[in-house]
Amino acid sequence: MAYSYTEKKRIRKDFSKLPDVMDVPYLLAIQLDSYREFLQAGATKDQFRDVGLHAAFKSVFPIISYSGNAALEYVGYRLGEPAFDVKECVLRGVTYAVPLRVKVRLIIFDKESSNKAIKDIKEQEVYMGEIPLMTENGTFVINGTERVIVSQLHRSPGVFFDHDRGKTHSSGKLLYSARIIPYRGSWLDFEFDPKDCVFVRIDRRRKLPASVLLRALGYTTEQVLDAFYTTNVFHVRGENLNLELVPQRLRGEIAVLDILDDKGKVIVEQGRRITARHINQLEKAGIKELEVPLDYVLGRTTAKVIVHPATGEIIAECNTELNTEILGKIAKAQVVRIETLYTNDIDCGPFVSDTLKIDSTSNQLEALVEIYRMMRPGEPPTKDAAETLFNNLFFSPERYDLSAVGRMKFNRRIGRTEIEGSGVLCKEDIVAVLKTLVDIRNGKGIVDDIDHLGNRRVRCVGEMAENQFRVGLVRVERAVKERLSMAESEGLMPQDLINAKPVAAAVKEFFGSSQLSQFMDQNNPLSEITCKRRVSALGPGGLTRERAGFEVRDVHPTHYGRVCPIETPEGPNIGLINSLAAYARTNQYGFLESPYRVVKEGLVTDEIVFLSAIEEADHVIAQASAAMNDKQELIDELVAVRHLNEFTVKAPADVTLMDVSPKQVVSVAASLIPFLEHDDANRALMGSNMQRQAVPTLRADKPLVGTGMERNVARDSGVCVVARRGGVIDSVDASRIVVRVADDEVETGEAGVDIYNLTKYTRSNQNTCINQRPLVSKGDRVQRSDIMADGPSTDMGELALGQNMRIAFMAWNGFNFEDSICLSERVVQEDRFTTIHIQELTCVARDTKLGPEEITADIPNVGEAALNKLDEAGIVYVGAEVGAGDILVGKVTPKGETQLTPEEKLLRAIFGEKASDVKDTSLRVPTGTKGTVIDVQVFTRDGVERDARALSIEKSQLDEIRKDLNEEFRIVEGATFERLRSALVGRVAEGGAGLKKGQEITNEVLDGLEHGQWFKLRMAEDALNEQLEKAQAYIVDRRRLLDDKFEDKKRKLQQGDDLAPGVLKIVKVYLAIRRRIQPGDKMAGRHGNKGVVSVIMPVEDMPHDANGTPVDIVLNPLGVPSRMNVGQILETHLGLAAKGLGEKINRMLEEQRKVIELRKFLNEIYNEIGGRQEALEDLTDNEILDLAKNLRNGVPMATPVFDGAKESEIKAMLKLADMPESGQMQLFDGRTGNKFERPVTVGYMYMLKLNHLVDDKMHARSTGSYSLVTQQPLGGKAQFGGQRFGEMEVWALEAYGAAYTLQEMLTVKSDDVNGRTKMYKNIVDGDHRMEPGMPESFNVLIKEIRSLGIDIDLETE
């Protein structure tokens, strides 16, 4: 097996038993693929597929004018180049987007000609606004912030059948309903009422009998009955009737007379109920007709009109109940044939017939008018208006679209075989839905489960952006139609017709403020990936928190392998926001698919198929862990399987599919929890969620006990630097890596140089620090997709969210009561949990009414000491250590002229000055913040002079760019001359460059020439001369290209910045704040075991083992049993073994043992105790030594979820590490030196520091701002508010009878304005008295009572 550059430096011992059939797919594919599909960038006119932008344009164009004399057609579109790259957009606070240019064709028809001859055609490109681009990591930069568009899980379009679960009617009767949901357009509902009539609703308005809709479609009563019922035919023979017999229809009826066969034998006696046995006998006897008395048809319903044979007079309309009067008329008129509807109470109810009876309309027009009245109450209906409205509802492609998915789901549900068809409904569709609904009511067929993932689909970014874009285009369409009529008379061009503002506004609104456009969670790489793999049921067209019930939030059997059953937020959104499972993907219809291995007759193949929830229902699917022999055959007699969404057991021969991996059930975050199978689900949920809140520590530390997914997450998240192409590291420093690309990967005519600029100390969305550190050194060979630099929270290309801590589970002096955590001071000294937070502070200079604000170091009434960190431009220098209240940017604002006192006038006359007409509005460091300035950015509006600081920043940026380009040129030049050298050495020169004719060229000769002189050489072979010329041209060409690139960047830097109206200058100051761990910070493990640091103890007081090694953390053992997250105990044991093995390897290295011994010991670890075998023999001795050095701090282990280390393997590892197999050891109290009375579980657990830091929450106030109306102090840290002394606290003081304290709280400390000013003055004077007055809220109360018209006054004595 081949190891990558970083993998072979530190191999993880993997305990998995099952082979990798399939790698975990690229984790951001769902975002990138969807948006790539939407843009179709780089496609030519013929290559456009009917999706995304192209589809949106095609659905709106051509736009035809109202008169029909002009049309605007769509030809194609192209995307321009982005103005700035991603980093520049983030810095400048602009959107990373490309201009969209659409080619349209304006066609003007000749009015005079009859056949619409074309008079004029104009074609033009029109600018249609900017389209945001997705970065390579699946995010968008909108106004300088990284955002993610979360995918939405919504109800698929199609038709759904349901019932009310007996809740509507008091009898508990099930009322069935059907609903046709289009992708866009009106909803159509059919429903039964308690009397079993069918009603229809359009867009949830008032209901009408369903027959009204059928009549509006043009069906007559007879056609409707014909469609829904079969008929019984009776031939009238005198007093009796002969029934054309269909024996099946008699089942369950009571025989009205003896039924005899041809031979006169009685088959059914009169008065007996007819059973299936009787029907068999009747079918055998072959009776075709049955004679029944006339009153047999009483109460039956006619299926056809009964007409008097002689006069043509109508005796009974169709759908009329036959009574004795009608029967009398029939007998009189000698009618020969009567057709009645066949209905019964079991499986063929008279529902449609009953509905027709309550329907007041009798023809199509009346039905259309009735629908018009329901849709537009109060408007007078006309025939045309009614017809237009009805046609637009379901039959017009502009207003109604089922979409391809909707049509597919619709056809499948009503039992058709073809899955394609029109996007609008037709008559047959509506009748088919009604038939299916009636069948379900009759007991044939079942209702749908709307939480089944076959009925819910995922809308990804691309699709939602397309919908928004279409909305914008439809707005444009209206305006264009108006203007088209003027187009021919005024000779307008397409550009004059189209106003792109509505489109741009719709797109901007979607990306900027849609509910699904979320601020990217950038705490750590895992939170980024999770954010992009989210699936939300909320958002436009989705559910709302308040209305979502339990069923929607619950785990459904179809979630298996598609949506993670564990990872979802706690709180009101539980179950509505989910995460995609590790292997899930969407199919072309947007349904989630999961991969399976194909199983044929008990033999498991390596063929993999992706199936959606609907497709997998009929399969019998075995678990990934099902037992197999070497021939890949299932060997158990019965295998645990899933079939029809149920868990059962089946014989191996019945199995058709098998899971690809045990971790296919869970999401990325859950698959990072080792021993997940031993944790309670609720705690696993907390563990998954808390990993996303871990703050990247100063020095990342890989988990000793991981799951093997860490490398995938780090690689796919995009925080690491991954080699685009293989090659040799040419140079490397802290901020860039330069790779000379391997010859076989260089494309012709390009430099063969890859320069990777590393991100240094940049602020993330969550104010954490993003910093990349190189892993490679000069001369190293790297392959494509090797990891060359670590990002935040990654260690050698593996995700590293926390630190491995030595922990003990023991109750200790109550310091770890109720989940508190007791830490050792060593953790602080070693900076294990020190994190860097970067804060961005902004100072804006605006143009005010009284004049412009100015950024300057000349600030009135501020001492020298306060200005000592500012430069002459008034901006703090980089590297300054600043604390709360320090000035970062000096700024003065003009203030209005005030009336001067005579003294001031005199002073002014003497000192002559205008300093007092400005006030100090400088940017200061906020309270509670202390840090180092690491960067300053200055943005200046066009036309405003740039200060010295802005110019120096620009110069340093230009130098950086120049250095990059020079480096690139140096390598290009070097590589070119190397190729020339290999071509020239050993060849003969003709002269030139001071050489004689016939002289052989050697390395020494070439070294003696300057590079420029090489091109003057004349060689004997023409091919070589040509090569020299080409090389010279290539180098000149590259130089010119790089100079152009530099000029382009320079132009961008020097042009003014696009600032908001009224803003002259913006200065951004970045502060790096170092936060050590301290009491009050929240910490957690990966198993939902969270707690708050309660105390930090000196190292010498901590419990220690017999060797004197103290523990770092003491955790409470009582936190484990009730919470049932035993995974943390197993992790602790395995962590102890991992650390012990590392120490053994360290001792071997210190004793300088032979490599062969090292190999033997490593082989014991990796290949002799269960799990995956590692090919250590492929590594050279140096690589083995490198590996051993990296294993000194512990051998990292991987225990994949549901396929991890067994207890026996953990014990074997402990034994190999010379540790007690129980995982427990005798500890001693550091303060007394006494032994604790029983052995304690000690080991290594991976602990995270969460982004809930006490520094961000701690807050105190003495005086500050007050609310405007009530004059009470504001609340909350952000407003610098006070602590609320609430109702219950008042009761407490009342209960103690502390009257003066209570009075103080309710008056001078709250909203007694005069009292609190006096109090302040008294304290300043050293006189500690208070004079309480009237609280302001009392005055508010009086005002409110007066506003009710009650005159109220306070009587003061």
Swiss-Prot record:
It catalyses: RNA(n) + a ribonucleoside 5'-triphosphate = RNA(n+1) + diphosphate. GO terms for biological process: DNA-templated transcription. CDD domains: RNA_pol_B_RPB2. Gene3D superfamilies: 2.40.50.100, 2.40.50.150, 3.90.1100.10, DNA-directed RNA polymerase, beta subunit, external 1 domain, DNA-directed RNA polymerase, subunit 2, domain 6, RNA polymerase alpha subunit dimerisation domain, RNA polymerase Rpb2, domain 2. It holds the Pfam family RNA_pol_Rpb2_2. One of its GO terms (cellular component) is DNA-directed RNA polymerase complex. GO terms for molecular function: DNA binding; DNA-directed RNA polymerase activity; ribonucleoside binding. It comes from the Bacteria. The keyword Nucleotidyltransferase applies. Keywords: DNA-directed RNA polymerase, Nucleotidyltransferase, Transcription, Transferase. Its EC number is 2.7.7.6. NCBIfam families: PRK00405.1 (NF001616), rpoB (TIGR02013). Belongs to the RNA polymerase beta chain family. This is DNA-directed RNA polymerase subunit beta. The lineage of its organism: Bacteria, Pseudomonadati, Pseudomonadota, Gammaproteobacteria, Pseudomonadales.
